[in-house]
């Protein structure tokens, strides 16, 4: 195994060693028998159709794209978004979270734009390329007795060294972050993958980060970088104790000792938050329950509507969890937080709150199930003096992928930018909330008025993705909303994909720029903007 030395860290070259001999073929045959006997192959794969379907190949940089309008100088850099794009067809089930990570990038410089798409070359991806087919267990398989059998197939392949799991088996398909001169591709079931961004916008997977072997657990897809200190705060969750482990990484890339967080059961913890002095963990009742998977023929994570939602507030440099304060609120689940800050005796969390989540809906084979999804913007307050917790609804449904001006991460800010959705997956518009304004409690749908300061509607048959805020001038000295929102859009009427840029202050229906892309860009997950300074900084390594 090779490595490339970095200050306070080593990027591991991912060189798995799978085996494709007689034993591998025998296990493949056994799997085919199990699939034939226990899997209903007539079920359609909604997440592999329409614009959820993967693109077959990578696209090297395509230059001088058509730009309607103008691309402001502050957008010099590369806008990147990652999402699931399976290289090979599934053996049986498929969940939206299962696909191989593919990064779509728009390189912008001096008003011109180039497009590129590249797979993240994970250990999983490399091994399935070696076999020329799908070999790793999928979330979409983990249902009922069939799920248990597929878990055992994965364990058998690992035990017989057909698959090499020494580098993990994640997809790097969920989110992106920049820290310590590196762009990282993330999925919460694995360690980070480092991505190099070239001057022409091209992308290359350098390898995996394990922070000099100090990282021995999974790494969330939603770490937080403090813009004032340069530190990155992160955690990982597991189905074995300790169920949650908290980490602090210095601005120089050194990972501090692990801090186990004590909770009673293994849960899905997709996100967390930081303030200037605290980190906030969410012990929400979406439990890892393999027995219920088999008994009830559900996915391996199931939601318990009888349990409270718990929020743990920990001093962010704590060496253990002795001083964590737990607060309870009514039952819910949260995929994504917008931001958090301290306000006198209270910790304030701005988040998207979901009642009665059902991951079967996210991975559902039946398209109509997608309409049963309600996600709303909430303000939650945790009083560190009295121990009381309260919450306030800030929006109608459905809002997700909340973003802020990241110069204010962990500090009080005014504006939240989110996506409006007609289902769990299709983004119909970009919305701007003013937290200084009161919500219009009489409204049952999202429209301008009250605390909704703007709404950019994509129009019939057009759907978008997470919008990233890019300030005109970095920092907190300029107006908080003096900048732009940039995001991918797909037009299902024409089959064409675009990048839109809109004015974050005005939220006008007229975009600042629209860039036509040379190929279809499937719907995906989270996005990030690599500034020109960051692009040049990481190019030195």
Swiss-Prot record:
Metal-binding among keywords: yes
Pfam families found in the cross-reference section: RPE65
Organism: Pisum sativum
Family to which the UniProt record says this protein belongs: Belongs to the carotenoid oxygenase family.
Protein name: Carotenoid 9,10(9',10')-cleavage dioxygenase 1
UniProt entry tagged with the keyword Nucleotide-binding: no
Originating gene: CCD1
Keywords: Dioxygenase, Iron, Metal-binding, Oxidoreductase
GO cellular component, as recorded: chloroplast stroma
